[in-house]
């Protein structure tokens, strides 16, 4: 069947009527086409006008779709704007949070009843100061835990006096205020008493194991390896062959501060650098010392921090602070007292021969990160102040300050109105990720505050004294009349706070779960076929079913807390029989009436239970 095409049509002709070319011949359309096979097409427009002008108008290029959308010229193709999904903030205040269900654990091992062993030290280098005429040996801590990746680590010990939570807080030697082994990077080296630190490469920071939350606290730092002192007579030949002695920075830092940088690189630290005595905060250096004066080897730098009472601090972060009613924060902290609900969401685990706690650490907030890297002096979210309504992390503490002394001489107060740190100004990282999304992110574990911090670079070394005997000594009172105390006194206070918090956790666990009836825990139904607790993120999320222990269903509640009298007896005996000086948690809780440690006998296992084994982490 042949196709029929009207005459004058512009469409192609049928393949049947089209001639075929033999192979090897020239293309068909290279010559003149006969009228029979010619294709009809409309006549092209006349080009006479174009040829006479000699020029051709430039074609206008059409804007791209993105440009048209930006100019608002192509409204039809603009996709509809998505509604911003506001994530509901389910975080609860620390005062409204209760203890999490203790994990289902095997019975403590005999070794769990013993305190943690001293850290193993490996010799690295020796620093000698010609100005001071002393030498210091520095060691690397072998196989140490480091606070990172959103988690913080501490040490635990099994105690039969705590049948519900089974373990309580403890620490590793040396038992005094010092630099923390866990709160420092691996590049930091310690002296044997952990009061002196150094680093051989880039900037690294070490934080102490004591923090200031309210009141006036003081510590001293002496440079043992740094900028040479003017009294050191060095010839030209000696100076050319003399190795650099490094640099140091001193100050205070919060737990959110980066330890792989120098103190003051962000909004979470306040420091002073040895070169020219410049003060540093959020990467901004400002002149502070007189011109030509620096911090040199042998100099003693005193750091005094003053913080308002926690009662005023809470009003600032809650947004209820009124200076006309609450004052300006200059009144001594002894005039105002407040109750604090310490929430420590911890997971116990074995690490080699030790038993440790793992808990969420605080993380830096977006507002302060943006402010630290903002080149403008006025941040996008408004200037930091006690009344900043954008975010609690941008609020500052009235009456707070940091004063710096050099060799006993007061140099001035470079930092005032320090950033608030109580939750929700500080937020805990979640167990699943570091976004801090969850109802327990505002929990206060009692160790959120400002820590003494020292940064070292290229071999710089610093020795600190957190309590007497001092090299120089602090003033008797701060500018607001607050009595000045050595921050090392916080060591014993933190032990007492840990002991009280452990007792409160045990009593709360006894009252809430001591008389479990059926499969209902705290008015929340749990699957009767539950296989016990699961660790990690499910427990930190606060799920009742995640930490439910079905073994306690058949155990009478009264039989479980028959040994709770040991708590008060051990506490009383530890306080009366402890030696003068520093206390330890073992002195407070594990010392009997005769002054000897309690025997390492594990508590009696529960009836009708199947012993399980904990998974060791290495």
From Swiss-Prot:
Keyword Nucleus: yes
Residue ranges with Low complexity bias: 8-19, 37-49
Deletion phenotype: Impairs tri- and dimethylation of H3K4. Results in sensitivity to 6-azauracil. Leads to increased production of several secondary metabolites, including gliotoxin. Does not affect pathogenicity in a murine model and the Toll-deficient Drosophila model of invasive aspergillosis.
Comp. bias (Basic residues): 57-69
Superkingdom as given in the UniProt entry: Eukaryota
Compartments where located: Nucleus; Chromosome, Telomere
Keyword annotations of the record: Chromosome, Nucleus, Telomere
UniProt domain B30.2/SPRY: residue ranges: 157-368
GO molecular function, one term: transcription cis-regulatory region binding
Record's keyword annotation contains Nucleus: yes
Gene3D superfamilies (UniProt xref): 2.60.120.920
GO CC field: chromosome, telomeric region; Set1C/COMPASS complex
Region (Disordered): 1-91, 588-618
Family as reported in the entry's similarity comment: Belongs to the cclA family.
Subunit structure: Component of the COMPASS complex.
Protein name as annotated: COMPASS component cclA
Organism per entry: Aspergillus fumigatus (strain ATCC MYA-4609 / CBS 101355 / FGSC A1100 / Af293)
